[in-house]
């Protein structure tokens, strides 16, 4: 294993020493300044790399919003076409269960209820 020698301020040294003491009290016999320092260095390096990925564009909110809008629009168009087929189907007309005047308010109510689960304030704004 490669060796790295670093200098730290007294506060950092005391905190690492405290961690070693706690680990030894927990029964971890191989706890040492070297082991704990190595663990902290690895964790810090992981955090640093994650931050760099985010800066380089790991997640793009605008692209996500665009993708979600596109998919929701497709689903809405498909549902509209399916609803048209159901309303125009002679069997559906004969049964009376697929009257557009009844279906549309039921769909609107369902959508409002689902949205209000996550966005309860929006329901108050619409009324």
UniProtKB/Swiss-Prot annotation:
A cellular component annotation (GO) from this entry: cytoplasm
InterPro entries xrefs: IHF-like_DNA-bd_dom_sf, TraM_DNA-bd, TRelaxosome_TraM
Subcellular locations according to the entry: Cytoplasm
Keywords: Conjugation, Cytoplasm, DNA-binding, Plasmid, Transcription, Transcription regulation
CDD domains xrefs: Tra_M
Disulfide bonds: none
MF GO annotations: DNA binding
SUPFAM superfamilies linked to this entry: IHF-like DNA-binding proteins, TraM-like
Function, as annotated: Conjugative DNA transfer (CDT) is the unidirectional transfer of ssDNA plasmid from a donor to a recipient cell. It is the central mechanism by which antibiotic resistance and virulence factors are propagated in bacterial populations. Part of the relaxosome, which facilitates a site- and strand-specific cut in the origin of transfer by TraI, at the nic site. TraM binds to three principal regions in the oriT (transfer origin) region; 2 are required for autoregulation while the other is required for plasmid transfer. Plasmid specificity is conferred by the TraD-TraM pair.
Assembly mode: Homotetramer. 2 homotetramers cooperatively bind to DNA although they do not contact each other; cooperativity is achieved by DNA kinking and unwinding. Part of the relaxosome, a complex composed of plasmid encoded TraI, TraM, TraY and host-encoded IHF which binds to the F plasmid origin of transfer (oriT) in a site- and sequence-specific manner. Interacts with TraD. Probably also interacts with TraY.
Family named by the database record: Belongs to the relaxosome TraM family.
Protein name: Relaxosome protein TraM
The gene coding this protein: traM
């Amino acid at each position: 294993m490669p060796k790295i020698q670093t200098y730290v301020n007294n506060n950092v040294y005391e905190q690492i020493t405290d961690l070693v003491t706690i680990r030894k009290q927990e029964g971890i016999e191989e706890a040492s300044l070297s082991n704990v320092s190595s663990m902290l260095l690895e964790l810090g390096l992981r955090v640093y790399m994650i931050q760099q990925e985010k800066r380089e564009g790991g997640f793009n909110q605008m692209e996500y919003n665009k993708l979600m809008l596109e998919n929701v629009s497709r689903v809405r168009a498909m549902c509209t076409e399916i609803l048209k087929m159901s309303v125009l189907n002679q069997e559906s007309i004969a049964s009376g269960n697929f009257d557009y005047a009844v279906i549309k308010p039921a769909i609107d109510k369902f959508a409002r209820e689902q949205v209000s689960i996550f966005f309860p304030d929006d329901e108050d704004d619409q009324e």
